[in-house]
């Protein structure tokens, strides 16, 4: 169904009207970031005027809004009007407000195609205010936040699902791209449930050598391995009574899958080397960015285990589909990093020394236009780089690494269906099976090195971007003497870098150019972490 202005439901099963919306991405009053105005007039064929004094924009938890009220934005409005097919026209008219749309100055008028509006158009007004023109669904209710930042409908859906299943004992499978916040969602499920006072433990199954997976999960008796002089408790026993978060569940070795299935079905585990079962009362929340159904078809993952893990599934939205949340997330991460270097008052509106100009509006606009293949995790890392690179300076400065990042078009999976994904659980992100795969021989040395660097030496993200399997990527890395592995680094080099970077693992990854997971293992082996 489509409204008069061309803005309607995505699919006949939906009854909620989606409306054109203006959301504040940057305002000199930092408290205004996240405010929005639903432009219902456009949906019924009327024009919307945008000026210093209109429309009124309200924060998600407020009923009454305020206009922009910035003296650099003209009182004379520019106009927005529907093109009738889901597109929107911007007409400057007599407005003296300088408008930049997606990085291009608007001289008189500009038409935004339906696909641009769906993606979100970043509007910079007078170099002072940044707005996002997009289409979204006004919320009918607001679920608890659970520590998750943002009010995009896709995130509201996640929050509602967490509220729905938190007090139940069913296993939960969190699905979605890497870096979308699956561990935060897992912790929210734990904190909102009856096990909140018990342990919450997480283990990344992709970061553990297959030979150690069994003992890490289920423990081991003394003498189970050569050189093992003490018993090992294992994550299931350590999380007894609480919640166990199994990240990258798709990387579980086949022999461990059998043991994991038994633990889920019976609540009993067998430590390695033991013939006697132990009780393990845990709630399991698993996470993956893999296509587990494809792994089942290929024999790499057991169907019964998938069925047992997915008592309830929650899809985590990618950041590019939450463009209206980017500025609030950025502000949150910047404040966190500033606090770490004792400059926390820079962006605190309650502090007399608050300096909103330290954060340039144009930078916020550029970050909002980027597609974030690494999602929220990548945005957090960029915030850290920005703060450290601008430490002690009067204004935030963009270093060469961030500048290079923003000039690169984000690599995205090429899906067969290019229509925007619906904001409902029934329409999950495109399966990884839709990616256009390549032969490893098609990947050149320079392309390989650039992809690794652009994805911060994350092998899974790099393999996905290159369109090859992770096994093929490992082989290419092994064949290329230019690329070092964490195992190639000497203890002296690692210890020296550890001291230089103050133990910051992210900074060490940038400096040493190796996988974060593998470097973390080396640090643990050296008892530095």
Where are these regions (language model features)?
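Dynamic helix-loop-helix/coil hinge segments at AAA+ ATPase domain boundaries and subdomain interfaces
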Residues: 136-160, 211
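Structural recognition of the conserved hydrophobic beta-strand(s) that form the central parallel beta-sheet
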Residues: 245-246, 282-288
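Forkhead-associated
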Residues: 42-120
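Conserved catalytic/switch belt of AAA+ P-loop NTPases
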Residues: 222, 256-279, 290-294
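Nucleotide-binding/hydrolysis machinery
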Residues: 195-198, 273-283, 291-418, 453-456
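Conserved post-Walker A coupling segment in P-loop NTPases
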Residues: 147, 161-226, 237-253, 318-323, ...
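Bacterial C-terminal helix-turn-helix
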Residues: 1-12, 16, 36, 102-105, ...
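Intrinsically disordered, low-complexity acidic Ser/Thr-rich regulatory segments
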Residues: 1-71
């Amino acid at each position: 169904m489509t409204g008069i202005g061309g803005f309607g439901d995505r699919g006949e099963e939906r009854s909620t009207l989606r409306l054109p919306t203006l959301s504040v991405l940057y305002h000199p009053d930092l408290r205004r970031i996240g405010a929005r105005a639903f432009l219902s007039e456009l949906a019924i064929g009327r024009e919307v005027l945008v000026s210093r004094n209109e429309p009124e924009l309200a924060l998600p938890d407020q009923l009454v809004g305020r206009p922009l009220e910035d003296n650099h934005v003209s009182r004379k409005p520019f106009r927005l009007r529907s093109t009738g097919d889901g597109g929107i026209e911007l007409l400057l008219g007599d407005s003296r407000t300088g408008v930049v749309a997606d990085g291009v100055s608007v001289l008189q008028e500009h038409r935004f195609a339906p696909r641009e509006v769906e993606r979100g158009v970043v509007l910079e007004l007078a170099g002072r205010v940044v707005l996002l023109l997009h289409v979204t669904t006004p919320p009918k209710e607001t679920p608890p936040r659970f520590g998750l930042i943002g009010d995009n409908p896709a995130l509201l859906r996640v929050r509602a699902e967490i509220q729905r299943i938190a007090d139940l004992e069913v296993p939960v499978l969190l699905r979605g791209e890497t870096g979308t916040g699956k561990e935060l969602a897992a912790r929210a499920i734990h904190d909102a449930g009856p096990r909140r006072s018990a342990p919450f433990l997480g283990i990344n199954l992709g970061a553990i050598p297959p030979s150690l997976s069994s003992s890490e999960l289920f423990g081991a008796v003394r003498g189970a391995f050569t050189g093992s002089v003490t018993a090992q408790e294992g994550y299931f026993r350590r999380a007894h009574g609480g919640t166990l978060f199994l990240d990258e569940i798709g990387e579980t070795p086949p022999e461990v899958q059998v043991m994991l299935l038994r633990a889920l079905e019976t609540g009993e585990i067998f430590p390695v080397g033991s013939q006697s079962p132990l009780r393990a009362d845990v709630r399991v929340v698993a996470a993956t960015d893999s296509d587990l159904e494809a792994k089942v078809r290929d024999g790499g993952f057991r169907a019964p285990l998938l069925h047992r893990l997915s008592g309830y599934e929650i899809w985590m939205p990618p950041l590019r589909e939450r463009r209206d949340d980017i500025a609030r997330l950025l502000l949150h991460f910047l404040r966190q990093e500033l606090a770490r270097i004792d400059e926390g008052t820079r962006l605190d509106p309650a502090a007399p020394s608050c300096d909103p100009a330290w954060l340039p509006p144009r930078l916020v606009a550029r970050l909002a236009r980027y597609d974030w293949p690494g999602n929220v995790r990548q945005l957090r890392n960029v915030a850290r780089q920005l703060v450290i690179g601008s430490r002690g300076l009067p204004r935030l400065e963009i270093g060469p690494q961030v500048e290079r990042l923003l000039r690169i078009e984000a690599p995205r999976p090429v899906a067969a269906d290019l229509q925007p994904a619906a904001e409902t659980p029934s329409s999950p992100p495109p399966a990884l099976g839709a990616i256009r795969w390549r032969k490893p021989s098609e990947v050149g040395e320079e392309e390989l090195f650039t992809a690794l660097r652009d994805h911060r030496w994350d092998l899974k993200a790099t393999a996905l971007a290159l369109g090859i399997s992770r096994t093929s990527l490992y082989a290419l890395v092994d064949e290329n003497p230019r690329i070092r592995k964490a195992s190639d680094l000497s203890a002296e080099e690692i210890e020296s870098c550890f001291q230089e970077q103050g133990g910051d693992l992210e900074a060490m990854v940038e400096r040493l150019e190796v996988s974060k997971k593998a470097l973390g293992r080396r640090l643990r082996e050296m008892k530095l972490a």
